[in-house]
Amino acid sequence: MAGPRVAAFDGKSLATTPVKIIGDFFAFEQALRNGIFVTAGDINGDGFADLIAGGGPGGGPRVLALDGKSLLSNQYVNLANFFGGDVNSRGGIRVAVKNLDGDTKADLVVGSGAGAGSRVTGYLGKNIAADGTPTAQFDFDALAGFNGGVFVG
C-alpha cells in the first residue's frame, strides 16, 4: 500500500515528460500506508488553488488544507487541520471543493469513509481556519442504513 505522499504535476506536460510544479511531500505521517484522498480549490480566496487532503482507507477522518501559493515555493502553510468525523473511525474521509455560497472562496465537502455510514458534511471556506474544527454548514446521511461510506465530488 502507498503512504500519504503528494506530488503535483503540470497537466500540459503529462503526455511527454511530466514536470513537477511542487516538491513531493507527505500530507500525513510517513508511517501511514493507506494513501490519501486529495482535491484542490481556492478556500482562502487568494487566487491560488489550495491543496486539501483527507485520510485514506484505514486512516482517521483527518482533513488537512495547505495554502497553494506557499506550496509553489515549497513552503507548507496550514489553512486547516481537523477531524471531519468520528475520530475513532478508520474509514478515512473523502474530500471535494465547490463554491456553495457564491462568494470568492471555495467551500469544502467531505464524505465519510467505509464503516462510518454515509455522512456528507459541508464547510464554508470563510469558516475554515488553521486551528479548530469549522462549523458545518450542512451535515446529512446520504444513504440511510448504508455503512460503506460516500464519495463526494
Residue ranges and their predicted role:
Residues 1, 45-55, 102-112:
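Acidic/hydrophobic-patterned starts of short beta strands in beta-sheet-rich repeat architectures
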Residues 2-6, 20, 34-36, 49, ...:
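Repetitive beta-architecture junctions, highlighting loop-to-beta-strand starts
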Residues 4, 25-40, 81-97, 139-153:
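Repeat-based blade/solenoid architectures
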Residues 5-24, 62-81, 119-138:
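Beta-propeller blade repeat segments, especially FG-GAP/WD-type strand-to-loop junctions
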Residues 8, 51-53, 65, 85, ...:
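Functionally constrained cores in energy, signaling, and assembly domains
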